Amino acid sequence: MPQPRRSKVGDDIRSSARERAVHFLYEAESRSIAVSEVIKAQILPVDDLVAELANGVELKREETDELISEFSHTWTIQRIPAIDRNILRLAIYELIERADVPVAVVINEAVELAKRFSTEESGKYVNGMLSAIAKRVRV
């Protein structure tokens, strides 16, 4: 009998930071509040990397959303499930602002988050979108 697929997400500090940042981004969007408010409301301390990622995505949201809209072709950004949209935003932010993180790592982490929190199909969608976007923003 095959073993269930183990997620690679959460295997290290950076992976955990990405996951927590996506949760904060999703909550902020769902509640129509700033991500800084979500961070302030946390009982447990928020790691610096989590705050940097979540706040950075919020600052670059217009730019990331333009890229998502451009590369999603037939889908409007609002039609993309909220969790997938926020995973894409985080990954695109990293592609643009964190040149120290290899493209393959950014894409793999995003795909794993999509598979874990959305659907297998979302993982494929995220992979295709980010592969195309990476060719544009990481020349």
Give, region by region, the residue ranges found by the protein language model.
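N-terminal interaction/assembly modules
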Residues: 1-123, 127-139
